[in-house]
Amino acid sequence: MSFENKSRHLHLWELAGLIALCAVMLSGLWAEGRQTSIAGSLVRLHVLAVSDAPEEQAVKLRVRDAVLECLTPRLADVHDADKAGAVLTSSLDLIRTAAEGAAGGRAVRVSLGEERYPTRDYAGFTLPAGRYRSLRVVLGEGQGHNWWCVVFPPLCLAAAEKEAMQPVMNFEDYALITREEGWEIRFRIVELWGELINSLEL
């Protein structure tokens, strides 16, 4: 191969690499925007047990039930995530009291902030990895297996349906998380991007 042909060959590879890099960056920006949009419609609940001992895992579930019982009437007439966040912020002491009542003397910490979540499958929909507003309930040192769900809209209960997402989400976000026909590849892009960012921030 002549020098001229080699040079042309290298330029083609460089161009292909540049195009691929641009495609990845654009996909990443789109994926980050979609995850941020999805997260902006929700509030997650994260309960961490003292340890993995069966007794502590049972306590974790009792605390979960007490927190949900406390929150259900307070969020019943709430229709957007920002309002839900405001209600939760003003109810942190009540939530802590409810959790302590079920914790059997264990230390309880309750906070509302942002947390990174992995990709998580629920009944009929999947939430991609990324940052979400999160009500965090920690028992003791929180070294045990955790439990998480979506507290707004109220999807923590067994009878909850994915359709509860529709009033609080735009069409594109809802189509993504429910993986409607034709949206599977786009969801996978969002999922992979979120998992990549999660791993970089560990």
Which residues does each PLM region occupy?
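Hydrophobic membrane-insertion alpha-helices, especially the h-region
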Residues: 13-29
